[in-house]
Amino acid sequence: MLIRFKINEIECEVDEEKEDLTILQACTANGIEIPRFCYHEKLTIAGNCRMCLVYVTNEEKLLAACGIPLDENFDDESIETEIDEILKAREGVMEFLLINHPLDCPICDQGGECDLQEQTIAYGLDTGRFYIKKRAVEVKAFGRLIKGIMTRCIHCTRCVRFLTEIAGVNELGVLGRGYNMEIGTYKKNVIIESELSGNIIDLCPVGALTSAVYAYKGRPWELKNIKGIDIFDTVLTPINYQVKGGEIFRILPRINDRLNEEWITDKVRFHYESYKIIEKMRKDTPSYKIQANKFIELSWKTALKMVFKVLLNKKNKVDLIIGSKINSTNLRIYKELMNRLGSKNYITENGLLFKKFNYDFRENYINSNDLYNVDQNDLVLLCGINLRVESPLLNIKLRNINFGDDEIETRKKIGIIGNKFDWKQESEYLGSTVNSMLKVFEGRFPYCQQIKKSKAPLILVGSSLLSRIAISLQEIRAAFEIASNIKPENVLLITQGANFGMALEEGIFKENFSKGGNVLYSIDSNEYKVSKTINYIIYQGILNDTFENKIDLYLPSKHYFEDFESDREIYVNTFGQRSEIEKLRISKGNKIKENSMIGYIQLMYLNKKEMNRKEKEQKEIKITYRGIKQKEKRQVKINKNLTINNIIDNYYMTDINSRLSKNLMITGQLRKEKKIMEAGSWKNKTCI
């Protein structure tokens, strides 16, 4: 039904069948601004603040625009948003909100981004009439990352609704009523155990919840935005680095409804403090180990001569392991280098997890389903994946699928194979061993009947499963297709590392990579154990905290967001979507080189123009193909009793950046050991 109505004498129309809008949404769609505090488009409607009051003809009282849906009753009605009655009501609402608000604006970190400040100027009174003592609320301890000065709180409940509805934790709530109403944890001094807790900082319209790491560091108008990505997650969430004077001050999300909506993880939001520590600890010149724990500095010319001597020695067998943050240009350069050396023994750091992988076809490692329409799935099966720590943003998309009101039926729709984790209460746990996976293929669980009945199932396969058994994703898809007639595109692979798909695109993978060489050439990679056969290590990267004392030759290189020649670089996520990042310069030493520059120098007889020409030709070639839907039958020896363990033990300490971030490290320890923070502990901490 087409509904016709007027907003401030402007004629509007809405198709009720296509659009389910409230008055506030209709006004916003027609370019009419209505002030609000509690309303947020990604959260349920609360109607707490009453700032969005509007007048509707034939209604006795003003209505809250955020909570009134447009239906057939509004046909030929008129809505007013700027009449004197409404303006006076807004002044009254603002006066009540400001009654207890402290005069912290000069020192508040929300300054310049404060909704309360802006709406007070636009809609508030110029004088205050409140003469009684203002109420003060004690500082709340929400952990090392979030500073809670709750005297500033206006009780919009955005933080409560986000944590409950989206993050899936019930640790914040509204306590008391009336004058004594507060927002806090149900238990005193309990930290918020969510990998996405930092998003309540962005949601808070006032300065009640702010970043403890950013406290008193800068003002938003001083900071420059530079596009980046969440390098810790294969989704490659778009972010903004906010920088000043070559230093990162904050990291904020960029809105992308197909990927992250407007959320980012705590790890990417707060890890940036580690870059300052790295710059203090790292050397800016090459160094060579002359004896245990004793290094001498070298010139780049001498260091590269030593590299050539080692790599060109025919007696040496070189293993090349490339870090998970290296971009596609550098992947191509070092693959070319190894090919010129006559070696095929190269792999990425995250590729070490897989015993077998068929990368002949792009559909085997790039997922065609981007989970934007995840609500259409009627069944979810997680195979060897802990979404809370492996991909928190995918976790919140999937855990909020509405399968219906029947709790028993809902439980039958969600299955988990692998280690248990706190994902969704109404789920069916099928076991933690490889044998459980085989039983699913054989249809020996009652849950398998649900899989067969499902019209739009979603199967997520994680690295934990493929790292345990020598079976490829293609074979898993074929098994599901034979057992339950599930289409291959409904079986998705969620890997670790930002460049896994790009590396497979370049053909950088070696099955059963043995690390059997005697020379290890590591490009910004240190998340693995060094093989006993290695007697010489060349480490080229930022800083190595895993096997630093074993390194023989160190070549300092730049961070991934500095390590490209042009001003922009493209990364490709697990769904095949391109994410653009801009160049960000924070390295202090002028002697530090880009990985690409070091690689070009090593390719002595291959100049840059030729490499650029090859790269351009590869980009222009378009190959159209169809995947082979062949149900291959072969015998595979599998230990059925192998446990599918999580590959991530501590979410907050997975790489050098997160390990060197003091606040992330302590947060990980606190959550792992379930310790309780003391109230106001952020005051005593040192933000590095």
UniProtKB/Swiss-Prot annotation:
GO CC terms of this entry: mitochondrial inner membrane
Pfam families the UniProt entry points to: Fer2_4, Fer4_NDSU1, Fer4_Nqo3, Molybdopterin, NADH-G_4Fe-4S_3
Cofactor(s), by name: [2Fe-2S] cluster; [4Fe-4S] cluster
Chain ranges passing through the membrane: none
Domain called 2Fe-2S ferredoxin-type: residue spans: 1-85
Residue ranges annotated for the 4Fe-4S Mo/W bis-MGD-type domain, each copy included: 223-279
GO biological process, one term: ATP synthesis coupled electron transport
Location(s), subcellular: Mitochondrion inner membrane
GO molecular function: 2 iron, 2 sulfur cluster binding; 4 iron, 4 sulfur cluster binding; metal ion binding; NADH dehydrogenase (ubiquinone) activity
Cofactor note (record): Binds 1 [2Fe-2S] cluster per subunit.
Leading EC class: translocase
EC number in record: 7.1.1.2
Alphabetical list of CDD domains matching this protein: fer2 (cd00207), MopB_Res-Cmplx1_Nad11-M (cd02774)
Role: Core subunit of the mitochondrial membrane respiratory chain NADH dehydrogenase (Complex I) that is believed to belong to the minimal assembly required for catalysis. Complex I functions in the transfer of electrons from NADH to the respiratory chain. The immediate electron acceptor for the enzyme is believed to be ubiquinone. This is the largest subunit of complex I and it is a component of the iron-sulfur (IP) fragment of the enzyme. It may form part of the active site crevice where NADH is oxidized.
Self-association and partners: Complex I is composed of about 45 different subunits.
Cited NCBIfam families: NuoG
Protein name stated in the entry: NADH-ubiquinone oxidoreductase 75 kDa subunit
Organism: Dictyostelium citrinum (Slime mold)
